[in-house]
Amino acid sequence: MSRYRGPRFKKIRRLGALPGLTSKKPRAGSNLRNQLRPGKKSQYRIRLEEKQKLRFHYGLTEQQLLKYVRIAGKAKGSTGQVLLQLLEMRLDNILFRLGMASTIPQARQLVNHRHILVNGRIVDIPSYRCKPRDIIRVKDEQKSKSLVQNYLDSSSREELPKHLTLHPFQYKGSVNQIIDSKCVGLKINELLVVEYYSRQT
């Protein structure tokens, strides 16, 4: 299944705010209308919608998300929390959380077009897994800096999560530590996502 490229507002109207996909928010009452539709949601549908939230927010294909779930399942600790940490530490998401891009798709374009360096080297893989002490910097070219400056100027300047530091005048950000799952930028029940996949096998 390919990455979603359809109408974004349609998705947030059904699933709620997906800040990684779009800065738009559902209209007041749209979630309420969904809740008032006839018929009780099945447990399967509830789990499916949580999975879809995760997939659309981070801009993943079905196969990519399944791969992350399997990696998380083999790691120590809570599978759901490890899954969120893996997704949050992706380079495209780190750029988004730093405010260097307005959405994760925009961050992915910056990486794909070789505007971003990690520890002094160009990285063109959006799924690159960032680690504590990594330094993310914009390439020292006017085009690269102009693109990121536009995003920085238009960002809402929300408080950065504790695992990140931004140096906007240097076009640079740093990863201080692995993210605490409480600081994830999406309202999600990750256990339902894990349950969804455990019932598919």
UniProtKB/Swiss-Prot annotation:
GO terms for biological process: ribosomal small subunit biogenesis; translation. Residues 23-42 are annotated as: Disordered. Keywords: Chloroplast, Plastid, Ribonucleoprotein, Ribosomal protein, RNA-binding, rRNA-binding. Disulfide bonds: none annotated. The keyword Mitochondrion does not apply. Its main location: plastid. It holds the Pfam family Ribosomal_S4. GO terms for molecular function: rRNA binding; structural constituent of ribosome. GO terms for cellular component: chloroplast; small ribosomal subunit. Residues 89-151 form the S4 RNA-binding domain. It is found in: Plastid, Chloroplast. InterPro entries: Ribosomal_uS4, Ribosomal_uS4_bac-type, Ribosomal_uS4_CS, Ribosomal_uS4_N, S4_RNA-bd, S4_RNA-bd_sf. Part of the 30S ribosomal subunit. Contacts protein S5. The interaction surface between S4 and S5 is involved in control of translational fidelity. One of the primary rRNA binding proteins, it binds directly to 16S rRNA where it nucleates assembly of the body of the 30S subunit. With S5 and S12 plays an important role in translational accuracy. Belongs to the universal ribosomal protein uS4 family. HAMAP family: Ribosomal_uS4_B. This is Small ribosomal subunit protein uS4c. It comes from Morus indica (Mulberry). The gene is rps4.
